[in-house]
Amino acid sequence: MLKRTMGRLLLTSLVITGLAGTIDDNSISKKERKYAIGLMKETRDEAINSTKNLSEAQLNYKAAPEKWSVKECMYHIAGAEKLLWGMFESNMKGAANPEKRSEIKVTDEQFVKMVQDRSNKLQAPEPIQPKNTGFTSITEAIEDFKKNRGEHIKYLKSSTEDMRNHVVQMPFGWIDCYQLCLMIAAHSNRHTQQLNEVKADAGFPKQ
């Protein structure tokens, strides 16, 4: 009888302190987790594979003076990965604001397509202009990108945080922090497309 009572007390204690995993678990759904992780992995591989086996001439080629080279696209992708994740962490540390969810006007899929749409041209913020990222070689940028993306995927695999109820106001409208994760992946795809446009240019060096 005493053992049974002690067992119940221990279980109650675990639940109250959250160690039993039933409190403060505001996880995204399995479907949402799978979608975000899949997008993170797919867009990571696309970006890295698009830079393989290129010469210095190919990495530095610009279709026009004001255009970015392959190397500069990769600098921007890697720099934005850190900047956007910093934004994500900052907003997750703040108070949840579920009352702002009504301000979100796009589904996850619509938002990803919007970010990836290259017909909608935008000016990159100064801190993630290629010249301001601090990278000195494409190898350095790729390694930094791989490391950070790996950490972000690891977070998404295990996080129980309430991403949906941390809502962020962006220049284009309101999104939640789960969608901000999707934005990180979609953004790298957007600029991988740009990188591939450079490679498809008629003047791109053959070697």
Located regions from the model:
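Start-of-domain marker
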Residues: 26-67
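Short, contiguous alpha-helical
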Residues: 61-110, 154-207
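Residues that form generic nucleotide/phosphate-binding pockets
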Residues: 39, 50, 87, 91, ...
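Generic structural signal for well-ordered, non-membrane alpha-helices
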Residues: 42-52, 82, 86, 119-123, ...
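Stable alpha-helical elements in mature extracytoplasmic
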Residues: 36, 43, 47, 69-70, ...
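Short, helix-capping/interhelical loops that line the mouth of catalytic, cofactor-
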Residues: 12-35, 86-143, 202-207
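Bacterial N-terminal signal peptides that target proteins for export
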Residues: 1-10
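A charged, solvent-exposed segment within the mature domains of Sec-exported extracytoplasmic proteins
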Residues: 118-184
